[in-house]
Amino acid sequence: MSSSSSSSTSMIDLMAAIIKGEPVIVSDPANASAYESVAAELSSMLIENRQFAMIVTTSIAVLIGCIVMLVWRRSGSGNSKRVEPLKPLVIKPREEEIDDGRKKVTIFFGTQTGTAEGFAKALGEEAKARYEKTRFKIVDLDDYAADDDEYEEKLKKEDVAFFFLATYGDGEPTDNAARFYKWFTEGNDRGEWLKNLKYGVFGLGNRQYEHFNKVAKVVDDILVEQGAQRLVQVGLGDDDQCIEDDFTAWREALWPELDTILREEGDTAVATPYTAAVLEYRVSIHDSEDAKFNDINMANGNGYTVFDAQHPYKANVAVKRELHTPESDRSCIHLEFDIAGSGLTYETGDHVGVLCDNLSETVDEALRLLDMSPDTYFSLHAEKEDGTPISSSLPPPFPPCNLRTALTRYACLLSSPKKSALVALAAHASDPTEAERLKHLASPAGKDEYSKWVVESQRSLLEVMAEFPSAKPPLGVFFAGVAPRLQPRFYSISSSPKIAETRIHVTCALVYEKMPTGRIHKGVCSTWMKNAVPYEKSENCSSAPIFVRQSNFKLPSDSKVPIIMIGPGTGLAPFRGFLQERLALVESGVELGPSVLFFGCRNRRMDFIYEEELQRFVESGALAELSVAFSREGPTKEYVQHKMMDKASDIWNMISQGAYLYVCGDAKGMARDVHRSLHTIAQEQGSMDSTKAEGFVKNLQTSGRYLRDVW
């Protein structure tokens, strides 16, 4: 017992050091095994000291992590060049807000692809240079508060705040802004509680979509209603043109307003002209031993209980088949990801995010343009060697890997380059003529030329680099300031867990288009799916990191409620999941309400996808009626909205009985036409004027009976 007591005391001393945030340092890596016995003793202590259970469990994980890093450092200390030294492990307490008497500005962002975050950080960087006595903080909206009460408690303490808010899909907030947006838009009874807040909003959207910058507009309106003082008109960034120019114009309008708030009284000094630095990571080159460690780390990368974009599940492709007939000159793929035993789950109507690799031909072209070895193994660092941050604008670096892997997994190479990328290329162009041309394209004077030569021509980053061959940015610049991060592609899941619990089905049309420059654009993810090898064909099957994003595109909780589904082409995907779920209900004896599916394709002989399945759904009673529009069979083109008008009376009767309406597919064309048809049906069948009909349709949306999954 005395021995046990002594041992317990030493454990508590060790725990105290960890809790206080004091470094835990192993001076001799050879003694790493001793820490394994320490971990074992800690485990046994759990039984005797249950009050320390939570702390001890966490500490074991920390200690084991320390051991692994120490062993790796020791084994890789041969000929590595500029390998980062292992820093002492310090557990930091939660950062507390410190009132140092300085004025404070908070810059929030809600981003899906990183653009809003980039603009927020760019504003913060320049503002810090202009107003040195002010404290600026960049905040992810999802990290700002743990719950609704904390949102309100913290926001009412803000004096100056800026919101960078992207809108995507059917006028929806981004994933990291969804919780804030729901709370903020539902709080209509707060009164003018934000009278002390001065603010600005910059939105990111695409004018081709119906709900252009809806999220930014809604937040701006509510801020005014609740007493906040608008410093500058809401910025409406349009990604269909040059959103960087929109941001620049909004930012320039902001500075005079900020001067009146943040400049000290009597300070007449003119702000020093600010030039944004070209973003650059610090780069370390490693040897093969370091590469071996990272390969082991990546191989065990699925040990997560919660899967998201940062922690996806690497799923094998179980099934792949072509849905178009050989007569079709296009392609549509049915793909099934195997999630058996992973812990990854989904619900009918959810989306799956797929992180696909760039094509090898694309990567080869990038390697040629960079003129570097594909086997160069490196790591990126967002801080200097002394640990201080290089720039708050740098995105988190990806894990160490070789150059081919980095270009394959992480670099977006086929999108049109932003102006900031052209500036970065200009800084590393050895030919002065090329450097000046790149600078001109990125300048206000070159706005029209950039719009025509880059945006309208849809020139890819690699095409632009090929036009300026002397521009050879180093790795730190290329991955920080030239090539944006490759983003996941989202697909409506085309299955139901009631039928396919261990599979996620995807229905994907191949993207294969000729660009204005003559380049053939091959969609990154759709081409990967087209070329995927399923394990039903080979043990050496294809796999991809995936994760599930929840959706509100759900069937009514009451199965007897009528449903109207409208989805041409791959817009059929979520409705296939709906019908699988209804089939499972039918087979279990559940009574279903009326249902109709409006589907559209070009020709029955070419692209009537899932035709046999749809007929079986009708025969089983899972689907009451199937109405198909063929746009290329008759003398005139017929689309789903025409079929809707043919069934206007039936649709109105179903709506009158409480039906839910669902639309999935193209937001720019089809969804708008369907919306207009619905408006017309309400007018004609409901004997309403145009204003009342629009109000009726809007009420269907706000009450959750008119749902859209559009892109």
Swiss-Prot record:
Induction: By wounding and transition from dark to light. Residues 105-255 form the Flavodoxin-like domain. Its EC number is 1.6.2.4. GO terms for biological process: phenylpropanoid metabolic process. Residues 73-711 are cytoplasmic. InterPro entries: CysJ-like_FAD-binding, FAD-bd_FR_type, Flavdoxin-like, Flavodoxin/NO_synth, Flavoprot_Pyr_Nucl_cyt_Rdtase, Flavoprotein-like_sf, FNR_nucleotide-bd, NADPH_Cyt_P450_Rdtase_alpha. SUPFAM superfamilies: Ferredoxin reductase-like, C-terminal NADP-linked domain, Flavoproteins, Riboflavin synthase domain-like. FAD binds at R489, F490, Y491, S492, T507, C508, A509, G523, V524, C525, S526, W711. Residues 310-556 form the FAD-binding FR-type domain. Residues 1-51 are lumenal. Belongs to the NADPH--cytochrome P450 reductase family. In the N-terminal section; belongs to the flavodoxin family. This is NADPH--cytochrome P450 reductase 2. It comes from Arabidopsis thaliana.
